[in-house]
Amino acid sequence: MPTSYMKLPYEDRVLRPEALRSYDLETGPVGYSLDIGLNYYRGLPLSAVESLELTVDAEPVPEHLILVELNGKLFPTSQLSAAFTEFWPIKKDLRIYVFNGGIEDGPHQVDLRLILRCVYMQFAPGVWGMIDNSASRTLTLQGER
């Protein structure tokens, strides 16, 4: 049972203008990546991710097409709750890969809903402070990174 959500006023740090990139192999695009900044004043373990939903151009991205990268390791979203040894520092981006065959060059409306459990704020057993790390922004697809 979570408490109310805490949201700091720094959405521009979550989805920066250069965050959306094409992900290509020799045969062509296989998807895209999205870099996500942490809108909080402390780092958190990756297992603190309670909910991650991505919508691009009003189309929800299915969970099975997403991999999350942190510290050089890849995780399906279903395994994030077990990634308690992986720490997400505030100055490092979380990278999401979406393997959907790619998207067109140009601007895209990106809506991220990312809810985090604040592991430093446990009010009672199973009752945590929650952080709303969500953001919406129009991003232009960049070349491969």
Features from the language model and the residues they span:
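Terminal leader/tail segments of proteins
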Residues: 1-145
